[in-house]
Design a protein with these regions (language model features):
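N-terminal targeting leaders characterized by basic, low-complexity, disordered sequences
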Residues: 1-26
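Sec-dependent N-terminal signal peptides of Gram-positive bacterial secreted proteins and lipoproteins
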Residues: 45-52
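Terminal low-complexity, poorly structured segments
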Residues: 8-11, 44, 286
Length: 373
């Protein structure tokens, strides 16, 4: 069928061979369809690219292996396994690091106003005076001999104290001696304690440590500032989650200023535990505040690290924190097998796992994991 055109008024009208007008809307529909096709297809294609990129990025991010080589700041780690804070005994640590542990976090070293803590069954580990630099350096040298790295855990027991002096954010009884009661720390007490942590970090640097960890878990002094149960202050260090984070944030900032950017700064914090006053909002707020303050690493533990239930104890909360932060997060607590470590890494944004008791019991466990993986 041939088409003819006839000029009618202001427009050309398509005619068939008998002179009848062809329906104008057919051509208009075709034009509209072509127009929509040209617009919609590129949009759909663009959306598919974004979705595929997101899936690919997320998938690659979680394809992590226990034995990946990684980097934190200037440290090139040989795998994703740490030794957590459980001992400062040189012989015990050497047995562990010679079997390929990438990073060691020491047992808690007292930073100042020394007092006995029931948390340490071994000889108290001290960093509250320059005379201890030589002693702690021996441990760092042993770890470095095996191409591993070491962080010094900086610690004050707070209410975990069996004798005086005793410090806490609010007046409370000692956990180990009910006849002992602390007074609420004054602003001067807080600033002095912050300086103890700073001086301890400077000593760690002189001793050749690769970094420090601020021990803010297990209801120690720093930990108790984050608890709504033990921190009942109404000043700038209490009253809301941001204020309760201030003590450890100030410590981080002052340490960074004192030791520079070449040292790793890690923070160990409590997961959610309503019984001890650690709320979910407080936990996440603290994590964000620490990231903003400049920490390189966060390790998540709990107010009560000794559990009877099957581990990993703190995985769910650690996973939540890893989902909202852009710094490496470490999962610790009850990790006993390669399968558990592998599951944690592949099913979250958690970057590292830390073992303590299992490595003390079996220093060869990482070598066995590697051979049997």
């Amino acid at each position: 069928m041939k088409n003819y055109k006839k000029y009618s008024g202001e427009e050309l009208i398509n005619l068939d061979e008998k002179g009848n007008a062809i329906e104008k809307d057919k051509e208009e529909k075709k034009n509209k369809f072509n127009f929509k096709y040209k617009i919609i297809i590129p949009i759909i294609f663009f959306i598919l690219i974004i979705v595929c990129y997101y899936i690919s990025f997320h998938y690659k991010k979680n394809i992590k292996n226990v034995f990946d080589e990684t980097t934190i700041k200037n440290l090139k780690l040989k795998n994703r396994v740490f030794l957590g804070p459980i001992t400062h005994n040189i012989e015990k640590i050497e047995k562990i690091v010679k079997n390929n542990i990438s990073l060691v976090v020491t047992d808690g070293a007292f930073v100042g106003d020394f007092s006995i803590s029931n948390l340490q069954p071994e000889k108290p580990f001290r960093i509250d005076d320059d005379k201890y630099i030589k002693e702690i350096k021996e441990l760092a040298d042993v770890v470095h001999k095996y191409n591993s790295y070491i962080l010094l855990d900086l610690f004050h027991p707070g209410l975990m104290t069996a004798d005086k002096p005793i410090y806490s954010p609010s007046a409370d009884k000692s956990f180990f001696n009910k006849n002992l009661k602390s007074k609420a720390m004054t602003k001067e007490d807080i600033l002095r304690m912050e300086d103890y942590f700073v001086q301890a970090a400077k000593r760690a640097k002189k001793a050749g440590y690769d970094g420090i960890e601020i021990h803010g878990a297990h209801l120690t002094l720093v930990s108790s500032f984050s608890s709504i149960k033990y921190n009942r202050r109404t000043d700038e260090y209490g009253g809301n989650d941001e204020n309760r984070s201030k003590f450890i944030v100030e410590i981080v900032k002052k340490i960074k200023q004192a030791v520079g950017d070449d040292m790793i700064i890690s923070a160990k914090i409590d997961s959610v535990d309503e019984e001890y006053g650690f709320t979910e909002n407080g936990f996440l707020t603290l994590g964000k505040a620490l990231e903003k303050s400049g920490v390189d690493l966060i390790e998540v533990s709990g107010a009560n690290p000794v559990r009877k239930d099957k581990g990993p104890y703190f995985f769910n909360d650690t996973k939540k924190l890893a989902d909202i932060l852009n710094i490496p997060i470490v999962c610790i607590g009850g990790i006993k097998s390669y399968e558990q470590a592998d599951y944690i890494l592949k099913n979250s944004n958690i970057e590292y796992v830390s073992l303590s008791r299992e490595l003390l019991k079996d220093p060869d466990i990482i070598k066995k994991w590697y051979l049997n993986k």
